[in-house]
From Swiss-Prot:
Protein name: Uncharacterized protein y4jC
Family the entry assigns: Belongs to the transposase 34 family.
Pfam family, one: TnpB_IS66
InterPro entries: Transposase_IS66_Orf2
Organism annotation: Sinorhizobium fredii (strain NBRC 101917 / NGR234)
Keywords, in A-Z order: Plasmid
């Protein structure tokens, strides 16, 4: 899978949404519930109540993209349900879409070099 670029921001809505909503409904939800601009170029991720489905919307500069993924078995790992949104790194997003538990992956701290060769 080709993952999102490093500079891309991913925002996950923590409340489940009704998946009968279409693209226009999700765009409206980004503005009202997440208080964000749906046309800013960020990826917005929404979850179903059963946690086996997710939807993403993304403005690519020429139009809105809506993608849906259903897991055949298992569930996506999402943060606890609360109001608002969670910001996620592109690496965490790639793990989420792959159906892996992205909350168990811990990044090792990297020591900054002290000298220039």
């Amino acid at each position: 899978m080709i993952g999102p670029s490093r500079g891309l921001r991913i925002m996950v809505a923590t409340q489940p949404v009704d998946f009968r909503r279409g693209m226009n409904g999700l765009v409206a939800l980004v503005g009202s519930a997440l208080l964000a601009d749906p046309y800013c170029g960020d990826i917005f991720v929404f979850r179903a109540k059963r946690c086996d489905r997710l939807r993403c919307i993304y403005w690519d500069g020429s139009g809105m993209i809506l993608s849906t993924k259903w897991l055949e078995s298992g569930k996506f790992i999402f943060p606890p349900v609360k109001d608002g949104a969670l910001h996620m790194s592109p690496e965490e997003f790639s793990l989420l879409v792959a159906g892996l538990d992205w909350t168990r992956v811990k990044r090792k701290p990297v020591k900054r070099p002290t000298k220039v060769a």
